Amino acid sequence: MSDGTGTKGALLIVNIVLWLLQIALGAYFLYSAYMLFFEPGMVNKFNDIGFGQWLRYVTGVLETAGAIGLLIPGLSGLAALGLALVMVGASATEIFILANGDATLPLILLLASVVVAIFRRGDITRFVSRLSPGR
């Protein structure tokens, strides 16, 4: 018979791995947001995209908010979901709009964000249930 120690240990390991992934994603998205705001080459890239510089700033703000949200218990699942949506847009832009686009990194970040969102889906459902108190 098992006393549940193995299951608790496995859950602890999964939780630690998720936190490490969230920290890594948060650090990358903060770096990416910094580049969006301050790297002159990003101005040219967003000119090539054709939607104007406002999209660069919106993307930077979303990435900053998502990076911070990844590190806040209770918001990490929602932040990961939001960042996954940003990476869907980034991947589509790299594939369909930019002439020499490379969607490899956005797709990797999309996958990692989806993994966090799936494993932290309890955060998402708790957040949604708070929005609809009548249920």
Segments (PLM) and residue ranges:
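Membrane-interface extramembranous regions
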Residues: S2-R135
